[in-house]
Amino acid sequence: MRQEATCSLVLTQDAQHRKNQPPLAEEDDDRDHTDDAMPPPCSILLRQEEGEATAAAAGEGLLVPPLNFAMVDHGVYRSGFPDISNLPFVESLRLRSVLCLCPEPYPEANQEFLRAHGIRLFQFGIDGSKEPFVNIPEDRIREALKVVLDVANHPVLIHCKRGKHRTGCVVGCLRKLQRWCLTSIFDEYQRFAAAKARVSDLRFMELFDISSLKHLPASFSC
């Protein structure tokens, strides 16, 4: 009985205390509760930080291909001139050979890279002149094609400065050896040359005589 009386007294006093409290101001009910929002749990913050760190690390190891890089066939690639930032990507191709169509001396940094990875350099300098009536040296195109046709040089990367005209002519003549129709050859050339396609290049590929070179199957992988 004494315990029940004590509990009743406590409840009565608590009720009386709340009754005597002043009412809450109305502005408390209308206040903006955005400040009361709970901060995100630590686990979420940690996951966000880990994600940002992973993305940064991935960015540092990103492989950047050279301008106009593409696979021509099994073991044959084409591109513009690889610069220093492209060398990690070039390394991933595990090349045996590089075929350069520029007449200028090959950069020392690129030569060091080739030596370090046991990659052989073939260079057949072709003038990159934009003059419409400058003849394309057919003999150098033929020598370049012989390098590409020798599977002992594969994987091989063919490149000029931009990977458009000189590289496009070599690849176009290679396609003739693979028995591509001219429409498909021209379409591939224009895909890389775009608005800078040259009529002289198209004419050269059309008239190029493949009789002295061995013909290929549809693909080097055959």
UniProtKB/Swiss-Prot annotation:
Q: Where does 1D-myo-inositol hexakisphosphate bind?
A: N135, I136, R140
Query: Record's CDD domains?
Result: PFA-DSP_Siw14
Site Transition state stabilizer: list residues: R166
| Compositional bias (Polar residues) | 1-14
**UniProt cross-references to InterPro entries, sorted A to Z:** PFA-DSPs, Prot-tyrosine_phosphatase-like, Siw14-like, Tyr_Pase_AS, TYR_PHOSPHATASE_DUAL_dom
Q: Which Pfam families match?
A: Y_phosphatase2
An MF annotation (GO) of this entry: inositol-5-diphosphate-1,2,3,4,6-pentakisphosphate diphosphatase activity
**What's the main place this protein lives?**
nucleus
Q: Which residues form the Tyrosine-protein phosphatase domain?
A: 68-222
**Keywords associated with the record:** Cytoplasm, Hydrolase, Nucleus
Keyword Cytoplasm listed? The answer is yes
* Family recorded in the similarity comment: Belongs to the protein-tyrosine phosphatase family. Atypical dual-specificity phosphatase Siw14-like subfamily.
Under which name does UniProt file this protein? Inositol diphosphatase DSP1
UniProt source species: Oryza sativa subsp. japonica (Rice)
What gene name does this entry carry?
DSP1
